[in-house]
Amino acid sequence: MKVRASVKKLCRNCKIVRRNGVVRVICVEPRHKQRQG
């Protein structure tokens, strides 16, 4: 899980999801998981 000021899609499988006011990236590639912090 990467914590970043700006989350970006890293590949075509990445999806940007908003959960409880937190922006996250979910992907089939575990290294692409990100959270805005």
Swiss-Prot record:
Protein name as annotated: Large ribosomal subunit protein bL36
GO CC aspect terms: cytoplasm; ribonucleoprotein complex; ribosome
The organism of origin for this protein: Acidithiobacillus ferrooxidans (strain ATCC 23270 / DSM 14882 / CIP 104768 / NCIMB 8455) (Ferrobacillus ferrooxidans (strain ATCC 23270))
The keyword Cell cycle appears for this protein: no
HAMAP family cross-referenced by the UniProt entry: Ribosomal_bL36
Key word DNA-binding present: no
Keywords: Ribonucleoprotein, Ribosomal protein
Biological process per Gene Ontology, one example term: translation
A molecular function (GO) term: structural constituent of ribosome
Similarity remark: Belongs to the bacterial ribosomal protein bL36 family.
Domain of life: Bacteria
One Pfam family matching this protein: Ribosomal_L36
Coiled-coil residue windows: none
